[in-house]
C-alpha cells in the first residue's frame, strides 16, 4: 500500500508517517537544483563521461530524479548513460508523483513517463528504463540500511536526502551512512540539505 500523504495549502506534500515536508519552502525543483545538482557539481562534472551513476537516499516524490533527468536532457555534454539509484522504504502512490510535478513544464512530461512505470513496487529491486535505455532508474524498496548493504552499487554522485534527522533518524544513522559510503569511490561527491551536527559527525566517521 502507498504511504499516506497530506497536501498543505501551499501545495507542498507532507508525510503523515514522519511528520515532515517532502521538500523545503523554496520548492522541490529549486532545492534539487541548488542543493543536489549544484552541490555535486552537476551537470559540469559529468561532461563527456560515458556514464554517470547517482545514488540517492530517499526517493520520495521522485523530484530529484526528475530534475536530474531534465538536466541530462538539456545538456549537450551529457553522458551517454545516466543511472540513478535510489532507496525508499515507503513509496508514495503514482498519482502523488504526478501531483508533485504538476504545473512544472520541465518536470511534468517526465513525471508522466515515470508514472507509467511506477507500479507493483513490492520490497526488492526494480529497474525502470527511459530514453531508449539511456536513462535507468533503479529503485530498491525497503529499509535503506539493508538495501544499501545488499547492493553492489558504485556512485559518482550521492544525494543524501530524506526527512529531517529528528523525524527519520534511521536513514541518517551511522550504519546507514557507512553502507552508503561503501558505494562511493575516490572522487565521489556528496550533497545534502541538512547541516545537523550528528550527520556531519557520522559522515566524518565514514571517511
Annotate each predicted stretch with a short phrase.
Residues 1-53, 69-109:
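Rossmann-like AdoMet
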Residues 137-139, 153-162:
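Short SAM/SAH-binding signature in class I
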Residues 61-66:
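Glycine-rich SAM-binding Motif I of class I
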Residues 98-151:
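S-adenosyl-L-methionine
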Residues 79-82, 184-188:
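A short helix->loop->beta-strand "cap" motif at the edges of active sites that frequently abuts
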Residues 105, 109-111, 197-207:
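Conserved Class I S-adenosyl-L-methionine
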Residues 89, 172, 195:
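Short beta->alpha hinge that forms the Motif I/post-I loop of the SAM-binding pocket
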Residues 170-187:
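A short glycine-rich, Lys/Arg-flanked "PGG" loop and its adjoining helix->strand segment in the class I
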